[in-house]
Amino acid sequence: MKKILLFLFFLTYSFNSTAHMAHYNKFNKIEMEILRDGEVIGYNYYFFKKDSDNTTVTNQLKFSVKLFGATIFEVESFGEEKYIKDKLISFNSKTRQNKKDKFVQLKLNDKENEYDIKGSSYTGNASLENVIGNWWSHKILQANSQISPISGSIKEQVVTFIGKEKIVLYGKMYEVEHFKLTSKDMTLPKDKRLNFDIWFDKKNALILKVAYSRMGNWEYKVKNFE
């Protein structure tokens, strides 16, 4: 039954895939809080700038994990995706993770019909079927692989429909669809493996919540969008 529901989900959204960026024309920003073990430790903000068929999505992320007052893990990142209509033209990011610099420089190669990537973990090309692994876009639920927005590495994934649910975020109830996003190869080391629960608000075409466990229980939750 789940396989049938999953097929119907992809069938429904495949007809709308060319209008993907149009779903976000109404947004100026999406604000997510980052929580670890129930405590707010940072934020993940997305800002949208539109000019005719051109859309720029700016991503700002920052969080830090402390233990007995000492910072044991921290990340600060800035990224920018550029689209013409529904086509990703370029993506660039710079990230500071535990005093280490990481980056991605991606651009569309029209001649070869692929992406050219130069990143801190991967340099080479990638199929246009890949998506940037950011939480603002529901296309991540339709893709077979994603490009890390921090390092440029390519990760194959499997998305499974769990069911329809109701969740409450900041005093407001939403009807959502619950998905599980995992690595295609689950034998990968845990720190390299994708293993996320995702709650998607179909009405607003918005991922409202993401949860995973790694050195604690993490949540990304949409606090505000406008």
Q: What are the residue ranges of the model-derived segments?
A:
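Sec-dependent N-terminal signal peptides
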Residues: I4-Y13
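Acidic, serine/threonine-rich low-complexity disordered tracts
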Residues: H20-N109, K139-E226
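Alpha-helical transmembrane spans
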Residues: L8, G133, S137-K139
